[in-house]
Amino acid sequence: SLVQFEMMIMEVAKRSGLLWYSA
């Protein structure tokens, strides 16, 4: 689902220390 995808993106962003994803 879209929500699950967004959650995954946020996880990756946190672990990589990037803030390229913001909603």
Swiss-Prot record:
| Function, in words | Snake venom phospholipase A2 (PLA2) that shows high lipolytic (1048 umol/mg/min) and weak ADP-induced platelet aggregation activities. Also shows weak anticoagulant activity (IC(50) is less than 1.0 uM). PLA2 catalyzes the calcium-dependent hydrolysis of the 2-acyl groups in 3-sn-phosphoglycerides.
Q: Which cofactor does it need?
A: Ca(2+)
What post-translational events are described? Contains 7 disulfide bonds.
State the taxonomy lineage.
Eukaryota, Metazoa, Chordata, Craniata, Vertebrata
Q: Which region is the signal sequence?
A: none
State the remark under miscellaneous: The subspecies C.h.atricaudatus mentioned in PubMed:20347857 is currently considered invalid. However, since different origins of specimens explain sequence variations, the specimen origins are indicated under strain in the reference section (in PubMed:20347857, South Carolina to C.h.atricaudatus).
Primary location class: secreted
Q: Does the keyword Hydrolase apply?
A: yes
Task: Write the protein's name.
Answer: Acidic phospholipase CHA-E6a
